[in-house]
């Protein structure tokens, strides 16, 4: 007796429904992978659970490319079937297409941030890890390149500053040398001009023959002249020519 055909209907038990969903989902993903490998086909599988969780499978993680290809194909097919379709319908389709693309990008962003990873299979996690490793390699390579460029720029500036300092030091030394030479020349010229003349030969004179001019001096009574030293000397010796002069006159008179 053959096996009877099982009627398909919704499983009322929540736990049984969840277990069945997990088993069938794994089988469906396995079948999709097998057909993509055996037949060299591009497969894209999208499944939403009753809680709204997304489960997907794509050949070589090319979900975006497959969806874009599907949209182009379906859009071209619709244009051939109904070339005179309403413009509003086209705008609605474009809106739905862009909305689906935005949702896909947001989901990928959450995956890159380590969120909503429960619904991903081991292969999807492995592909995500490879993408992150590749991104990290590019980031580190760019960072090392920037650091290398910064170091080269600092070394170039340091070399330029050293050359400038060397040039300034050389100019300062040359300037100091010129100033020392000018100072030595100036000292030699000043030494030659400021030498005192040799003293004149001394003449021996009698003390009484030295000319002496009376010098005025100020006294409380008025202005007086200093007394002549010769007169002072004559008075000190109490010598006078007046008696001799009178005597000679008397002799001539007699």
UniProtKB/Swiss-Prot annotation:
One of its GO terms (cellular component) is nucleus. It comes from the Eukaryota. Pfam families: K-box, SRF-TF. Residues 3-57 form the MADS-box domain. GO terms for biological process: positive regulation of transcription by RNA polymerase II. Its main location: nucleus. This is Floral homeotic protein APETALA 1. It comes from Sinapis alba (White mustard). Keywords: Activator, Developmental protein, DNA-binding, Nucleus, Transcription, Transcription regulation. Controls floral meristem identity. Is also required for normal development of sepals and petals. Is required for the transition of an influorescence meristem into a floral meristem. Interacts with LEAFY. It is found in: Nucleus. SMART domains: MADS. Residues 88-178 form the K-box domain. One of its GO terms (molecular function) is DNA-binding transcription factor activity.
């Amino acid at each position: 007796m053959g096996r009877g055909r099982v009627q398909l209907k919704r499983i009322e038990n929540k736990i049984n429904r969840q277990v069945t969903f997990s088993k069938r989902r794994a089988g469906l993903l396995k079948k999709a992978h097998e057909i993509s490998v055996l037949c060299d086909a591009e497969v894209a599988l999208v499944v939403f659970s009753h809680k709204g969780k997304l489960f997907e499978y794509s050949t070589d993680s090319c979900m975006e490319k497959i969806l874009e290809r599907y949209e182009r194909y379906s859009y071209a097919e619709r244009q051939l079937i109904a070339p005179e379709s309403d413009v509003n319908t086209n705008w609605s389709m474009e809106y739905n297409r862009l909305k689906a693309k935005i949702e896909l990008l947001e989901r990928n962003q959450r995956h890159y941030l380590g969120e909503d990873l429960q619904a991903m299979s081991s292969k999807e996690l492995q592909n995500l890890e490879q993408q992150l490793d590749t991104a990290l390699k590019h980031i580190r390579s760019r960072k090392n390149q920037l650091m290398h460029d910064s170091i080269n720029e600092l070394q170039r500036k340091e070399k330029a500053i050293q050359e400038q300092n060397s040039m300034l030091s050389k100019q300062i030394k040359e300037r100091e040398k010129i100033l020392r030479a000018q100072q030595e020349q100036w000292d030699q010229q000043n030494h030659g001009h400021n030498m005192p003349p040799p003293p004149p030969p001394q003449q021996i004179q009698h003390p009484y023959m030295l000319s002496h001019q009376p010098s005025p001096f100020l006294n409380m009574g008025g202005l007086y002249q200093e007394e002549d030293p010769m007169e002072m000397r004559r008075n000190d010796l109490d010598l006078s020519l007046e008696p001799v002069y009178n005597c000679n006159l008397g002799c001539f008179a007699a």
